[in-house]
Amino acid sequence: MLNFRHAIRAGLVAATVLVVAGCATVKPEPNLVAFSTTLRGGNEVPPVMTDATGRVYAVLDKNNLLLRWKMTYAGLSGPATMAHFHGPAAVGENARVQVPFQRPITSPYAGQATLTPQQAAEMMAGKWYVNIHTRAHPGGEIRGWMVVQP
């Protein structure tokens, strides 16, 4: 009976070591870069008074420059008429459209686009933002700067 208990105990220890070792070797994919932002009216230039808010989460694959994103929003003054990634610009500046979102723009929304090397570098440098436009705010109702997540 003692040998059976010893064998069970040894088996449990070995299984625990394997599980811990397996977890220790799991690493995040080094070629994927995660971004996120919160969309607010106060981030627009000039600022917009609105109760609307939103979130954008994106992942850039540095191997093929494929950008995938998901966006949610609520509280807009009306239906979203357009949404885009803009850049390059510093925070507080406006920039040209880099990647337009396909219509219809609804929440939740998901999209993807292949970036140029220059676009990917600008996004990695924090020089891109997302904004959502409405009829009441044709210049954009809410905006957020894409930030690399650690």
Where are these regions (language model features)?
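Bacterial N-terminal signal peptides
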Residues: 11-21
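Metal-centered catalytic cores of metalloenzymes
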Residues: 2-5, 19-83, 87-150
